Amino acid sequence: MEKTFKFTPEEFRTSVKIIQYLRTAIGSSLENHDEQKVRKYIHQAIVAGHVHRDVFGLNPILTSLQTAQIAVDEIGLHRDGVIATLLYGSVANDDDHEEIDQLFGENVARIVMGLAKIQKLYEKNPVIESENFRNLLLSFAEDMRVILIMIADRVNIMRQIRDVEQEEARHEVSEEASYLYAPLAHKLGLYGLKSELEDLSLKYLEHDAYYMIKEELNATKKSRDAYIQQFIAPIQEKLTEAGLKFHMKGRTKSIHSIWQKMKKQKCGFKGIYDLFAIRIIIDSPYNLEKQLCWQAYS
């Protein structure tokens, strides 16, 4: 007989903190009794035996809360997306669609069922590392929030599996993050999450390469930061003289990006010279965007 699902004390404390955060972050978009109904739905799923720890031993309810926090913080989802994220791990079958619709509305039900449909599509396609499958996912999701939640969930899982013992499962999850979820994040403009997925994938799949590059970047950080500021200064001066309103940012390229350059150029870390990138953001009326961007470029 399977043990009853339970929280560890640490999981419980972490869950309470995230719930308090979500309450503050999206409270204005919640409807009356939303929180109570979510709690009741999940509790019933636990009692019915529908909630189980995953292959890594992670608590699915805590995982859903963490994913919801990422979806709010880094993607900007609100009530419907958050509730769907919290409910999805407790859904037993397709018959739950009507109940979720009645409890939380059509939008939440559509997202939850969209996540279920994508999971079935995922399981039926043994080869998912192709552009065709990524496009199929995008076309198959009737609500784009489904894909956004999937990306947030994979980012969360990648953050949690650093010290797990299930090496084979971690390898598989990391490969999927690299060839499926990172390109999806890039396609949807989630560049920060895309870089994080790529870096974590490299960390788990090419451990030695990841830490070698990380150590080299740390060792050269002071001189590189000084060079970036020296590089930026005359550009800032020229743009200011031109009367442009702008923000300029310099950043070190991701570990994954540097590793790809090393492989492509067949050289070591010291053979890569473009280790940083400069981003200029022009504050402009819509009708003058192209003109002012070309002015800045020239």
Residue ranges and their predicted role:
Residues A25-Y41, H97-N107:
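Short, mixed-charge amphipathic alpha-helical segments
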Residues L86-G114, Q166, L190:
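Hydrophobic or amphipathic alpha-helical targeting/insertion segments
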Residues H33, D95, F104-E106, I128, ...:
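Short coil/turn linker and secondary-structure boundary residues
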Residues M1-S28, K40-D54, I61-L65, Q69-E74, ...:
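Nucleic-acid processing machinery
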